[in-house]
Amino acid sequence: MNLPSHQVIPLWPDGAIDTTGWNQPEEIAYLESGLKVIRNVVHPTLTAYLPDPSIATGTAVIVCPGGAYHFLAFEHEGTEVARWLNEHGIAAFMLKYRLVQTGEDFPQCVGEHLSSRQKMKKLVDPLFPLVLADGCQAVRLVRTRAAEWGIAPDRIGIMGFSAGGMVTLSTALNYDASSRPDFAAPIYSAPPMGGPVPADAPPLFLLCAADDDMASGVSTTYYKKWREAGKPVELHIYSKGGHGFGMNQLGLPSDHWIERFAEWLKAHGFLPESK
């Protein structure tokens, strides 16, 4: 199945965000591993991938790729996720959220930044409120235009991977009435912006691999927090998979994680039978 034609939607109205000093051009780039990514997002967008109307369920998922806040791994944590969701009647909206700006030394600088916790903290801490705002605005925008896209306004969720998991989990902790996700799925998530579990916290689907020390710690911590708050939560931990597997097929049980997600959606009434 090919992805249908898709619409790129600016996340914010003109002039709503301050881009002063954000001078690096957004572009496709490659990591030293050969991974194709997007870097230097200054103007956040949502890209709409809508399922065939004959199988559309009315459910929507905002998909947030990861990339250490320096880039977006937009294929195996973005468009490939959207393709699978569309095949199962689910509308997908890939979020390009704001990133650390990088220059001519990309991708070498990514490794240097990741090797220094102090340097990473200095770079990403100022970014956190911006990406949280992007996550909340994504939910708000999809809900505002739900009728246009054939989406049920009470079945709009958010999913993210690694840094995109941070966007997802932060959104699930720090929303207002217009930006509350109906469900959230942080996949091997980085630590979120804090805050107590809200009184009306959405159902949470957490997933990671045990051989991913960072994400397994975050996942178990927020499983406990949701449980202690009496909110619906499910946690899957695969013994192997590492960090960043996304839709890559590794010959491991983690290859089928997205099927577990769909089962969870059905169990909670977010995914009715397809037409």
Regions found by a protein language model. Give the residues of each.
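Primarily recognizes the serine-hydrolase "nucleophile elbow" in alpha/beta-hydrolase
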Residues: 127-201
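Short beta-strand element of the alpha/beta-hydrolase
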Residues: 57-66
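Short beta-strand/loop motif that positions the catalytic acidic residue
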Residues: 206-208
